[in-house]
């Protein structure tokens, strides 16, 4: 299989004198590449399972007509430095299209299988990565700072092209959407949507959209419609920022890294279950306040029954959708270079303290948005009794001979 790639760059500052504009370095670059991704293992033959001595027949047909997933990408950018390299900036734009992804679809009964594989789909990703930096030295003091920015947008351009036929039977293959359900959480892939779009089950509402309170039990009810999913958002961040600062003065160095994730939404099944069993702060507040406020002017007095319905596992998650925007102190370092004369100029020794993931300046979710149940397409942005995020503290000694 042929996967071509080509790259081209030009250092403009070497071709022309840009010093009058204050530019000490200017480079432009571009590239194009195609890469492949092999299908899953063991799908070209029938798979049988053995359970308690009983062999189960294969339900997914062996994949006979496979093509490798293919990604075509284009990238363009520039690097520039000003004022004798004291100020620097980079910017990159990329655009990728991925084809021939592997889907499972319901097979015709005559095939003897429940599902079959097919190569289809087209997903577009485009984004921008940029950074700006400044560094300078004033006698014994130096400072270097870098601000990073990135964003990515994706769009499902196509699932299965209209008119696609089963390679074995010739019957039409019609896939309008791909759904993956986990209780009241659904990931839906549909043309025009984005990877990361998710939907949740909600409470029963009246004709005006207000939460319905049953007059007999004086509590809320789950929406009985099995397809009554509410669009909750997308798990992907809208933007990401990072700000790194390095200070140095007479052998003492200080490094501070702050980063931010802006946008994206997730759900907390952990919070739902804690409410369900009455061991959360919200359930304690509801008991103390005489019930649960479901709107500005509507209260359900029976907190126990309310949380039994709304927090029953992952059955109803519309009340447990949170913004995953957060800003944190990602890393802090403090070091000291011991004078080399202490070691007769034969050894350079430095000691440093390092702290990572120390605390958050801002986070409204009851979980760490950077910790997720899975990195797969279908289970991101879900908090389900995840391991707590870790704050680490360390100390290092470095010797150079």
Residue ranges and their predicted role:
Residues 118, 137-235, 283, 295, ...:
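Conserved small-residue
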């Amino acid at each position: 299989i042929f996967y071509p790639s080509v790259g081209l760059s030009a250092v403009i500052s070497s071709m022309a004198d840009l010093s009058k504009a204050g530019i000490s370095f200017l480079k432009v670059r571009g590239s194009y590449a195609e890469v492949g991704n092999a299908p899953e293992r063991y799908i070209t033959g029938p798979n049988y399972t053995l359970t308690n001595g009983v062999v189960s027949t294969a339900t997914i047909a062996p994949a006979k007509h496979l093509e490798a997933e293919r990604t075509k990408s284009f990238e363009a950018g520039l690097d520039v430095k000003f004022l004798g390299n004291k100020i620097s900036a980079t910017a990159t734009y990329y655009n990728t299209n991925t084809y021939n992804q592997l889907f499972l679809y319901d097979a015709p009964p005559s095939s003897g299988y429940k599902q079959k594989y097919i190569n289809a789909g087209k997903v577009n990703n485009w984004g921008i990565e940029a950074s700006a930096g400044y560094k300078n030295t004033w006698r014994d003091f130096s400072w270097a700072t870098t601000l990073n920015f990135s964003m990515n947008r994706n769009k499902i351009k196509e699932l299965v092209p209209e008119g696609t036929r089963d390679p074995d039977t010739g019957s039409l293959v019609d896939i309008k959407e791909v759904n993956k359900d986990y209780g009241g959480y659904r990931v839906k892939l549909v043309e025009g949507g984005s990877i990361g779009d998710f939907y949740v089950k909600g409470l029963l509402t009246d004709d005006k959209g207000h939460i319905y309170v049953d007059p007999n039990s004086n509590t809320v009810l789950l929406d009985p419609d099995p397809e009554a999913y509410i669009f909750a958002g997308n798990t992907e961040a809208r933007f990401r920022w990072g700000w790194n600062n390095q200070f140095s003065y007479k052998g003492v160095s200080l490094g501070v890294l702050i980063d931010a994730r802006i946008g994206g939404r997730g759900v907390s099944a952990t919070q739902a279950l804690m409410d369900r069993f009455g061991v959360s702060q919200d359930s304690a507040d509801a008991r103390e306040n005489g019930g649960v406020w479901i709107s500005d002017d509507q209260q359900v007095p029976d907190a126990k029954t309310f949380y039994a319905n709304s927090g029953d596992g992952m059955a109803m998650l519309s009340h447990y959708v949170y913004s995953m925007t957060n800003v944190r102190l990602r890393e802090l370092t403090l070091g000291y270079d011991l004078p080399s004369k202490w070691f007769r100029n034969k050894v350079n020794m430095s000691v440093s303290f390092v702290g990572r993931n120390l605390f958050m300046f801002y986070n409204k979710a009851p979980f760490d948005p950077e910790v997720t149940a899975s990195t797969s397409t279908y289970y991101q942005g879900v908090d389900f009794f995840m391991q707590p995020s870790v704050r680490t503290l360390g100390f290092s000694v470095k010797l150079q001979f």
